[in-house]
Swiss-Prot record:
NADP(+) binds at residues 44-73. Its EC number is 1.1.1.62, 1.1.1.64. This is 17-beta-hydroxysteroid dehydrogenase type 3. One of its GO terms (molecular function) is testosterone dehydrogenase [NAD(P)+] activity. It catalyses: a 17beta-hydroxy steroid + NADP(+) = a 17-oxo steroid + NADPH + H(+); testosterone + NADP(+) = androst-4-ene-3,17-dione + NADPH + H(+); 17beta-estradiol + NADP(+) = estrone + NADPH + H(+); 3beta-hydroxyandrost-5-en-17-one + NADPH + H(+) = androst-5-en-3beta,17beta-diol + NADP(+). InterPro entries: NAD(P)-bd_dom_sf, Sc_DH/Rdtase_CS, SDR_fam, VLCFA-Steroid_DH. Pfam families: adh_short. The gene is Hsd17b3. Belongs to the short-chain dehydrogenases/reductases (SDR) family. 17-beta-HSD 3 subfamily. Substrate binds at residue 181. Keywords: Endoplasmic reticulum, Lipid biosynthesis, Lipid metabolism, NADP, Oxidoreductase, Steroid biosynthesis. CDD domains: 17beta-HSD1_like_SDR_c. Its main location: endoplasmic reticulum. It is found in: Endoplasmic reticulum.
Length: 305
């Protein structure tokens, strides 16, 4: 029995050490060492960003163009894409291609493939995603768009990765950033379908990272918490980053490993949340809090925007 306790203690200590090392890496890269633009450019001439019309996707489009890459913007609303493309070309001098596609549909990928033919794609950002309901709610109370969410949050990641990864493999270099969520790190009741879809992105990305790391391809999953975007409607503060703030910081960590929260503030949030015992996190009291006070907080955010 004594040996069992010693082994358990050593295991817990090892886990804590790994987490401390990961946090220290983020801390060092956040304040001491910036990733040179030449690294991102060395991946290839073009970056492809899904969900580029708003929020995080739009921010990645501008930031990667500022780093010297040409960008392919893929999203549903043509007018938004045209406006963003014009501004990127005017402010950065990078070339921009736009592809109108609705990721809630399955029949779009041949169309996307045609627009990507012949491009040296070095970076793919699988960002597009949707919430079934903005407010926390029980599964049967959501609007019934479950299939749309599966296509948008899961199918898009698989299909876009298939389109781009084989060319990266032949060139033996590339970077794929899959935007998951902190809600992927443990099941989140009242956001059950969204949490499950992001958990797929998390596990899929981690497995792919192992499969292709020896072929010169970096595959990293990002698990942010609160980001102020048109989809989330959060107000930004010290812990809630704007899309621009999050993207600029996240690009510092692309060489850190297969997983990152994307910013130092969210690494801290993850450490705190992961210390909450399941019996508390999944208690009736916690669920009532989400349904009442957290919903009220979200409503205040909307009214104050």
């Amino acid at each position: 029995m004594e040996k069992l306790f010693i082994a358990a203690g050593l295991f817990v200590g090892l886990v804590c050490l790994v987490k401390c090392m990961r946090f220290s890496q983020h801390l060092f890269l956040r304040f001491c060492k910036a990733l040179p633009s030449s690294f991102l450019r060395s991946m290839g001439q073009w970056a492809v960003i899904t969900g580029a019309g708003d929020g995080i996707g739009k921010a990645y489009s501008f930031e990667l163009a500022r780093h010297g890459l040409n960008v392919v913007l893929i999203s549903r609303t043509l007018e938004k894409l045209q406006t963003i493309a014009e501004e990127i070309e005017r402010t950065t001098g990078s070339c921009v291609k736009i592809v109108q596609a609705d990721f809630t549909r399955e029949d779009i990928y041949d169309h996307i493939k045609e627009h990507l033919e012949g491009l040296e794609i070095g970076i793919l950002v699988n960002n597009v995603g949707m919430l079934p309901s903005f407010f926390p709610s029980h599964f049967l109370s959501t609007s019934g768009e479950s299939q749309n969410l599966i296509h948008c949050n899961i199918t898009s990641v698989v299909k876009m990765t298939q389109l781009v990864l084989k060319h990266m493999e032949s060139r033996r270099k590339g970077l794929i950033l899959n935007i998951s969520s902190g809600a992927a790190l443990r099941p989140w009741p009242l956001y059950s379908l969204y949490s499950a879809s992001k958990a797929f992105v998390y596990t899929f990305s981690k497995a792919l990272s192992v499969e292709y790391r020896d072929k010169g391809i970096i595959i990293q999953v990002l698990t942010p918490y609160s980001i102020s975007t048109p989809m989330t409607k959060y107000l930004n503060n010290k812990m809630t980053k704007t899309a621009d703030e999050f993207v600029k910081e996240s690009l510092k960590y692309v060489t850190i490993g297969a997983e990152s929260c994307g910013c130092l503030a969210h690494e801290i949030i993850a450490i705190i949340l992961n210390r909450i015992p399941s019996r508390i996190f999944y208690s009736s009291t916690a669920q009532r809090f989400l349904l009442t006070r957290y919903s009220d907080y979200l409503k205040r955010n909307i009214s104050n925007r």
